[in-house]
């Protein structure tokens, strides 16, 4: 259970603007804007209801999503050293989200940014998140589109190749500059399957944004895959996939919510109460 885990650090502070502690060197303005829009959509769906408890899954040294006005933020990751440096959370807990049971209806918001592609059975983890959300709770996830060429190449190549790309082609110097982790890229996180899973779990998809990952964009520019050549490649992929695949849209951000009240259940309960009265 989440409350039984050992807290490794705790800030013991209230942060009016947690964003002031951002130092994520890879957070380019385009991705930052997409995540900010996701937060705005999540908060708008809550209609002004404040956030009591937020869970940031896989946050490491810095939270990529900051919910305004949250009373308490718990960050969790396997990276203990990274957690110790995270200044955007109130409590940092070293834990494996795959092996951890989350209490039912225990949090108001969950952020899971680029985590599900690294774990086995991400659909089960998604189900944990859905059960852990209180009524009105929101979930923001970011994952690669596993059907896109970038993810397919990643899945078919070893981690050593990924590290080579990061070091030699993207000029990353070490782990403090965002080196890659082993990936699973399970098919259950394909965008359409995530949307179906959300429906099964009783969540509403508030917003979905498909966009190009900054690493893919950097590599395209390095190898001059821009302009007409890139447009031709995109057209070819769209044609072969009958419009279902655009190689430029390599990643997605999705915003989901558990309804404040299930309309069908609420109507039945009210009807039964009225009949008894």
Question: Model-flagged regions — what are they?
Answer:
Residues 1-105, 109-111, 126, 210-211, ...:
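Conserved N-terminal segment of class I S-adenosyl-L-methionine
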């Amino acid at each position: 259970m989440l409350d039984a885990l050992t807290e490794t650090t705790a800030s013991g502070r209230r942060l009016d603007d947690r964003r002031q502690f951002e130092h994520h060197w890879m957070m380019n303005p385009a991705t930052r804007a997409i995540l900010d829009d996701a937060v705005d959509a999540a908060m708008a769906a809550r209609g002004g209801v404040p956030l009591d408890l937020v869970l940031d899954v896989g946050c490491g040294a810095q939270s990529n999503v900051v919910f305004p006005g949250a009373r308490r933020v718990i960050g969790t990751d396997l990276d203990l050293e990274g957690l110790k440096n995270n200044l955007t959370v109130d409590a940092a807990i070293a834990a494996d989200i795959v092996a951890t049971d989350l209490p039912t209806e225990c949090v108001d918001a969950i952020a899971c940014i680029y985590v599900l592609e690294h774990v086995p059975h991400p659909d089960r983890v998604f189900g944990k998140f859905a059960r852990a959300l209180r009524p009105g709770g929101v979930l923001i996830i970011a994952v690669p589109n596993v059907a896109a060429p970038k993810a397919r190449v990643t899945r078919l190549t070893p981690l050593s190749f990924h590290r080579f790309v990061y070091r030699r082609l993207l000029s990353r110097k070490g782990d403090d500059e965002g080196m890659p982790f082993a990936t699973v890229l399970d098919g259950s996180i394909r965008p359409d399957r995530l949307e179906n899973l959300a429906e099964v779990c009783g969540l509403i998809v508030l917003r979905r944004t498909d966009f190009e990952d900054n690493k893919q964009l950097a590599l395209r520019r390095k190898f001059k895959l821009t302009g007409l050549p890139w447009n031709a490649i995109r057209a070819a992929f769209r044609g072969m996939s009958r419009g279902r695949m655009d190689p430029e849209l390599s990643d997605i951000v999705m915003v989901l919510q558990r309804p404040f009240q299930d309309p069908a259940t609420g109507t039945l309960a009210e009807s039964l109460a009225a009949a008894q009265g």
